Amino acid sequence: MMRCQPLSLNGQLKENKMDKDFYKSLDLPVIAAPLFLISGPEMVIECCKNGIVGTFPALNQRTTEGFEDWVIQIKDALALFEKETGKKPAPFGVNLIVHPTNIRVKADLDVCEKHKVPLIITSLGAVPQIVDIVHNYGGLVYHDIIKKRHAEKASEAGVDGLILVAAGAGGHAGTLHPIPLINEVKKIFSKTIVLSGCLSNGNDIASALQMGADIAYMGTRFINVKESRAEDNYKDMIMQSSAEDIVYTAAVSGVNANFLRPSLEAMGITEEQWKDTKKINFGNTSDLAESEAKAWKTIWSAGQGVTSIKDSPSISELVPMLKEEFVFALDKQKKLLDTYT
């Protein structure tokens, strides 16, 4: 499989040695997003073996000890893969919920520091001290945002990249269209831009780069892979759904997120209830993990990109397909450009 060159579409990655080293082993400019309850070491390992960044939430393991076991499992599997094949796998990443009431965040960060996790994705808080710790061992920190104000705070914290969660993304999505969101953020941030929202095929990846992103962030597409921990009924519902079946509501967990309408209806949640809002209350870490898990286990999240998902391949089947579509889309764009020059 052809390797991607170090990305430099926006003139940033080629100037940052850490970024350049991080991405030189990619086959495709894609990060498989950390999916709550769904991403496990199996998915991360297969993503990295196939040349895209694999990630998972630290809270997918209920204890820090279990989390460390997963990190070790991933590192060992990727080291063995490189030894046996001579091919350097793509790097992996961990999502940390950086919130004052997450009492596990320091312990989980200590694990990341100990094992030098290449990429840390922070949510619900951009903390300079975390950035410093990760930079000291040579890692990168990306922070997910839904609006310019969040981007400004993350930029001040010194993060290496911003994940722009645009309208239509699965999970805790924003409400802004990707084009104005990218344009707003690029006014105040000159490092790596990662775009999330409705990216399900290779053409979508090419479109994300054309809009000004450096990397595509794909979540819903990876719910429907064989290595996913999602239930078969969940995968079937995604394949049967369209963009109109996605409901944006705070009724499930107190924070606005996108969910599958049939899943809400199956739990007896009415349209009136979708419009209810609740104040966010994370409680302690175990409460956060358990309460969120209970909600998201029975009510399934997905983005509007479901409209393009009609299968459930293995990651080793999906990545080459995405690459073929991506290359075809870029070639088509080049031919179109030639028409006007």
Enumerate the predicted regions with their spans.
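Gly/Ser-rich catalytic serine loop of serine hydrolases
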Residues: 36, 196-201
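Active-site entrance/lid segments in N-terminal catalytic domains of soluble metabolic enzymes
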Residues: 13-192
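Conserved active-site-proximal phosphate/metal-binding subdomains
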Residues: 179-192, 200-341
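Generic low-complexity, intrinsically disordered sequence content enriched
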Residues: 11-13, 17, 113, 219, ...
